[in-house]
């Protein structure tokens, strides 16, 4: 019995020992795994830190190399520019030497020509003297007396003519000095600014998302904008802006304002575009009148007919040879006033004539024709002074100036236009070509309006749908294309797009 109890106790003790051993081993293993896990995390963190340091070092090296390359590039660029400047200076020096040699050669040739002429004259005089001596030997006393009187009379006439020519030359020199003095006074007392006109306007966008809204579904919105406004709208990868392009400054300014309002409003669809366009057109009509009125107030030229006031304001949206028409007009008016004052003329009348001398340009883009004839007709219609009308004709040589004020306007116009950099011939030739294309289209029957777009490579012609069929529209496009080909010189091709649109509107109540 005791042995049995002892056996059971031994087994129980062994079981307890085994359990304790198992628990110890388990705890030991967990601690070991925890320790290993901590070591692994520490190593991973160390590796990560080391990798980050290596990355930073690599980035620093790359940045250093980029800066070194940039510095080297700038250094080489400066060297190239210096070399170019040196070459330009050397070329200019060579050109000056060539000019000096040509001038010297010309002078030598002139002197040789003078010497030859003198030699011929001397030989002629010798021959004449010999003939006279031979003739005198056979003359009577009366014949000799008459001969001497005739020669004295000829010599006297020659001396009188010489005196007249000398005084004419003196008068001419004095006149030139006086004219130069007047021009110098005018240019000194008036210092105007000049900025060339561009062919594009930039419209800033709040975000690039608006580009998609302006384009619209399947390009619906941008097509409506271009067709209604008559401009090119360029949307590219440039962030935050779109371009509005047109040779017509007034049309381009209206288009820019329409797009700005649409972007601010957020509602962009064809119906809204038409509504905003009508509103902006009325706004610009009022704006041009206000601008013209402000100019007249500044110059003190009231009263003037309101139609002329509006056209003066509209000159702001017209350019000639890249020179803004309003800026040119104001410059001419102020220069003419100074010149008229120096010559004892009517300053106010010269100022008024200068302001109105190019008034016809405000309508030439819409009407076509000569701005001189249009301007003169407008001033006659609104009872302007005859001197103003004469100045309009005279500044392009259609008439001779009949007053000091007209002459001052002509001189001021030439001075303003002839300044270096004031005008750009290439831009004007392009603008003239585009205007010719539009005028050919608008001259056709049943054409309501026409817009040249894509730098003059396409023209959109809007016709009256009630008076023209689809077949007639096709024939019209071919007719316009043929006339453009015959009358306008242009590179490449021009697409003629005749648009016949019918709208039906009903109201549900």
UniProtKB/Swiss-Prot annotation:
GO molecular function, one term: RNA binding
Gene Ontology, cellular component aspect: plasma membrane
KH domain location: 199-265
UniProt entry tagged with the keyword Magnesium: no
Gene, per the UniProt record: rny
Alphabetical list of InterPro entries matching this protein: HD/PDEase_dom, HD_domain, HDIG_dom, KH_dom, KH_dom_type_1, KH_dom_type_1_sf, Ribonuclease_Y, RNase_Y_N
Function comment: Endoribonuclease that initiates mRNA decay.
UniProt domain HD: residue ranges: 325-418
UniProt family annotation: Belongs to the RNase Y family.
UniProt GO BP: mRNA catabolic process
Subcellular location: Cell membrane
Coiled-coil positions: none
Name of this chain's protein: Ribonuclease Y
EC number(s) reported in the record: 3.1.-.-
Enzymatic class: hydrolase
Main location per the UniProt record: membrane
